[in-house]
Structure formats: structure tokens, C-alpha cells
């Protein structure tokens, strides 16, 4: 079990202000990201986008090719159906000058399922659209 670290009112207010101040730019960032098709085994351009964004924000970026032979004998490994030859992982790390507090790890994936029949979409799947305060688009 992990202990909760309290967030004081000043820190909470600073976080809320930072979100509000950067909302438009982050929404634009997400829209740019959604415009990049990233179906499974075709994630390269989306990974390049994220790696560049991490570098621009000052993160140390580790971008490496995933070797199937390193994984195939691990417990829980499942069969890969498709071309895994270009599979990569992109990791961004922020290393502060002074270590204070705890670490935070955010992990995710960026591949999306196929779009299906385009005529079933109200808007093109890779063209973000904001409706009722929510962004719609493949991967949003």
C-alpha cells in the first residue's frame, strides 16, 4: 500500500492554474496528435511526434527498437500477428537537479484499432472535432 502525500492548497491552486493557462495549447497538441494515423504496426510517425514533443519539453528521450527475440520466452507473451520488425518504444525521462519528493511514471500506448467503414464516421477519423466540450477522433 502506498501512502498518500497531501497536496497543500497553494500547490493545488498552482496545478489548476497551470491546466487552465495551458488548456488551449494542450488541446491543440492533442488535435495534432490525433491527426496522425497510428494503427498497430504503423505507429512510427506518432512515436516520432511524441519523441519530438518530449525533447522540446526538455526530457531525455530513449527511443529503441523492440527485439521480439528478447520477449518471446517471457511468461505471458502472446503471439504477434503482423509485422513487428519496426516496433519501438519511446520513453521520456525528466531528471531533476535535486531529488525532492516522489517519482511519477506515466505509461501508455498510441496504437489505435482500425477505423472501420468511413461512412459510419460523422467526421473523418483522423480529423479531430470538438463537440459538447469533448474531442472526437481516432485516438482522442
List each language-model region with its residue ranges.
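Acidic/His- and Gly-rich active-site-bordering loop/insert found
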Residues: 2-138
